[in-house]
Design a protein with these regions (language model features):
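Left-handed beta-helix
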Residues: 1-97
């Protein structure tokens, strides 16, 4: 399917959002890759970050160049620092990674 972009979301130049993804109330900076089936809500995704397929992110900040693996779940105001990698199937609720 297509991409669902709602809630006043903004997407920067050169960003790629995969099929079946939902972006709601987010700021997506330049050069971000969001793989198919991801859901990103009320979050900020910094330049060059990658969000893996079928990952759910809610209320988080993902730093520049960070990589979130496939089938991950991040929520609760979590901050992923620049360049950090969260492995596939990771579930994080703590404030910092």
């Amino acid at each position: 399917g297509g991409v669902i972009l709602v809630g006043g979301s903004a997407v920067g130049r050169g960003s790629v959002i995969g099929a079946g993804s939902r972006i709601d109330g987010c700021v997506i900076f330049d050069g971000v890759t969001i793989e198919p089936g991801a859901t990103v809500q009320d979050s900020i995704i910094a330049s060059g970050a990658t969000i893996g397929a079928n990952t759910r992110i809610d209320g988080c900040v993902v730093g520049e160049g960070a990589r979130i693996g496939t089938r991950c779940e991040l929520k609760g105001g979590m901050r992923v620092w620049p360049g950090v990698e969260i492995p596939d199937s990771g579930v994080r609720f703590s404030p910092d990674a």
